[in-house]
Amino acid sequence: MSNRFAVILAAGKGTRMKSKLYKVLHPVCGKPMVQHVVDQVSQLGLQKLVTVVGHGAEMVQEQLGNVSEFALQAEQLGTAHAVDQAAGVLANEEGTTLVICGDTPLITAETMEALLQQHKEAGAMATVLTAYIEEPAGYGRIVRNENGHVEKIVEHKDANEKELAIKEINTGTYCFDNKALFASLSKVSNDNVQGEYYLPDVIEILKNEGHIVSAYQTEHFDETLGVNDRVALSQAEIIMKNRINRKNMVNGVTIIDPSNTYISADAIIGSDTVLHPGTIIEGNTVIGSDCEIGPHTVIRDSEIGDRTTIRQSTVHDSKLGTEVSVGPFAHIRPDSVIGDEVRVGNFVEIKKTVFGNRSKASHLSYIGDAQVGEDVNLGCGSITVNYDGKNKFKTVIGNGVFIGCNSNLVAPVTVEDGAYVAAGSTITENVPSKALSVARARQVNKEDYVDQLLNKKKS
């Protein structure tokens, strides 16, 4: 197999997005558009990948890191001009170069591989990825001769009436012989309505020089969708969401209502897990097998063990063990580690806490900046008082501790193994192992006080 290279065009300003965010960095199913493209082309066995950047170059470089080399297009003078900026990296290379736009997040490695194979089998100097659509307005048209061979590509604004009737369109993805590509770029003119240097003109240049120009028509037009505004962004989101949901269902995940379930492109979900409506799984989340998630649950960048149930709750940047029960209406905040067989019940908030195996906080509790041992029971209304208005402090609760209802643990404080804290206590000092700590005012009953009070009011 000859050397393979790729150029991703990501220099456009994206003015139609009307956004401060650089166009190709707008996310689709939680991942920037250009990252989707890079992830797919990286499966093609490339020797070099060059991303052409312009406006917002630093942000794109930060996103892609060392996966790609970069070339700067300081002025946006057209797609041919953009590709020519990669000459410093690729011009002297021999092989095949794939050119693709960074705003086509739905393209797949399979389609690009088919394009590369067509290019090789045809012995072509250039091969264009085309599609057939009923309403081709806005797209460049593929002009073929009487033998069906590609003659040229005409941009919509430059097309005559006959060419506008053509329904085979240019998707903006190409293969070129690398040396032929860079030799032809200097011959491209900007004598057109837009006054730009069009990459499709290279097709006509190579054809006129007697080279073979080929085309590969894809049946998957949705893969070629270019995102230029928020409407197209929403369309790409829907298509990608359906693709991700289908992949998970094929792999054994039950999704009760796919139209109302959102899974990020990088999430991994085990078989026999059930996702209820309103579930949103974001980032690099990993969910085990036999779990039940939702309804109306958000999980972001977290690891969820097997046989765990999360209902109507939010989990961010945390790790949950096996057979954990969360919710309804619980909030597990970042940097929390929840052990196995744990119960985090309704209206419980946990933040930056290690919560040991088989421990329970069943309702109405806040546990922050804490280390909770195994087999601990936190009664209703148990609170770790971790903040003094300036600094955060740690609470340590040992194994087998019982915390009574409506108790405050004022950090920094330690409740040692096996200790009990009486309901209604405010604990400000360490509690020794197996001690009972009572920190509340003694109850006083005033006999017949109510009758005396009522009689006093009548008089």
UniProtKB/Swiss-Prot annotation:
Homotrimer. Mg(2+) binds at D103, N228. One of its GO terms (biological process) is cell wall organization. It comes from Bacillus anthracis. This is Bifunctional protein GlmU. Its EC number is 2.7.7.23, 2.3.1.157. GO terms for cellular component: cytoplasm; membrane. InterPro entries: Bifunctional_GlmU, GlmU-like, GlmU_C_LbH, Hexapep, Hexapep_transf_CS, NTP_transferase_dom, Nucleotide-diphossugar_trans, Trimer_LpxA-like_sf. It catalyses: alpha-D-glucosamine 1-phosphate + acetyl-CoA = N-acetyl-alpha-D-glucosamine 1-phosphate + CoA + H(+); N-acetyl-alpha-D-glucosamine 1-phosphate + UTP + H(+) = UDP-N-acetyl-alpha-D-glucosamine + diphosphate. Pathway: Nucleotide-sugar biosynthesis; UDP-N-acetyl-alpha-D-glucosamine biosynthesis; N-acetyl-alpha-D-glucosamine 1-phosphate from alpha-D-glucosamine 6-phosphate (route II): step 2/2; Nucleotide-sugar biosynthesis; UDP-N-acetyl-alpha-D-glucosamine biosynthesis; UDP-N-acetyl-alpha-D-glucosamine from N-acetyl-alpha-D-glucosamine 1-phosphate: step 1/1; Bacterial outer membrane biogenesis; LPS lipid A biosynthesis. Binds 1 Mg(2+) ion per subunit. GO terms for molecular function: glucosamine-1-phosphate N-acetyltransferase activity; magnesium ion binding; UDP-N-acetylglucosamine diphosphorylase activity. Catalyzes the last two sequential reactions in the de novo biosynthetic pathway for UDP-N-acetylglucosamine (UDP-GlcNAc). The C-terminal domain catalyzes the transfer of acetyl group from acetyl coenzyme A to glucosamine-1-phosphate (GlcN-1-P) to produce N-acetylglucosamine-1-phosphate (GlcNAc-1-P), which is converted into UDP-GlcNAc by the transfer of uridine 5-monophosphate (from uridine 5-triphosphate), a reaction catalyzed by the N-terminal domain. The active site is at H363 (proton acceptor).
